Amino acid sequence: QPVQATEREQAIIAAVRNAAPGHGLDPARAAAFFHDQIEANKLVQYARLSQWQLAGAAPALPRHDLQRIIRPRLDDLQTDLLHQLASFDQTRSRQCARKLALALAQRQGDALHRAGMIRATGQLCD
């Protein structure tokens, strides 16, 4: 499957905009947050594809079906993320950007996933 799935991304953003008011969120805020999640995911996917090209093969691991398993899980996660974003916004500190930077700096993991987290939270404190 290609990494870039413009129609799917547009459908997700439209669904998030529609669901946002039910969570007490501005549709533009929710759309920006989910846009960042999508872009972070693509950043990691493109990097992994590049690594696999260099290695000559993807890891020999079982792959989950995108249509039947992965996307339904992601759809369920949308509601949870909207709820968490609304909760975050209600308690957001004025020092959000600094606290976020500190939290990201303390995260474990490889450089690629740290970069993905930075991208995913790019507008979180706006």
Language-model features: where?
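N-terminal Sec/ER secretory leader and immediately downstream segment
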Residues: 1-36
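Extended amphipathic alpha-helical interaction segments
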Residues: 49-90
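Generic structural signal for well-ordered, non-transmembrane alpha-helical segments
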Residues: 10, 14, 35-38, 42, ...
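Alpha-helical context
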Residues: 6-13, 17, 53, 57, ...
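Glycine-rich, aromatic-bearing surface loops/beta-hairpins
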Residues: 85-126
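Short secondary-structure junctions and interdomain/linker hinges
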Residues: 23, 41-44, 81, 88, ...
